[in-house]
A protein has these predicted regions:
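Positively charged, structured surface patches that bind polyanionic biopolymers
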Residues: 1-86, 93-99
Length: 99
C-alpha cells in the first residue's frame, strides 16, 4: 500500500541518481512511496507502473533494470535496488532506505 514519505533534500543531489533521466528519478522516488517500513515492496512491474506512472508510456521493467545496476560514483558501487525472490514471490529492496 502506498505511504506518505518525506524525502531528504540530498535525495535530489545524489551523483549516481542525477546521471539518469528524470523518468528514472521519478521511478526511484515512487518506489520509496510504495515500500514498507524496511524499504521492501512486491516486484510487480504492471502494478508499479499503474501506481507510479498511471498516465505515461514508460517501460518500467527497463527502469527497474537501470536501478539494479552498480552505481558509478558510490565507493561501494552498490545498486539503488535489489530484486530477489522468496519461494514464488518476487520483491524489491531499496538499498539505502533506512539510512
Amino acid at each position: 500500500m502506498p505511504r506518505i514519505r518525506s524525502l531528504k533534500p540530498d535525495f535530489f543531489k545524489d551523483d549516481d541518481l542525477c546521471i539518469h533521466p528524470p523518468w528514472i528519478r521519478i521511478l526511484y522516488a515512487g518506489l520509496w512511496v510504495q515500500a514498507d517500513r524496511e524499504g521492501r515492496l512486491e516486484d510487480r512491474p504492471v502494478k508499479l507502473k499503474a501506481e507510479i506512472f498511471p498516465y505515461d508510456n514508460f517501460d518500467l521493467e527497463k527502469g527497474l533494470s537501470l536501478l539494479c545496476q552498480p552505481k558509478k560514483y558510490s565507493p561501494a558501487h552498490e545498486p539503488f535496488i535489489v530484486r530477489y525472490s522468496v519461494g514464488n514471490e518476487k520483491y524489491i529492496q531499496i538499498i539505502k532506505f533506512l539510512q
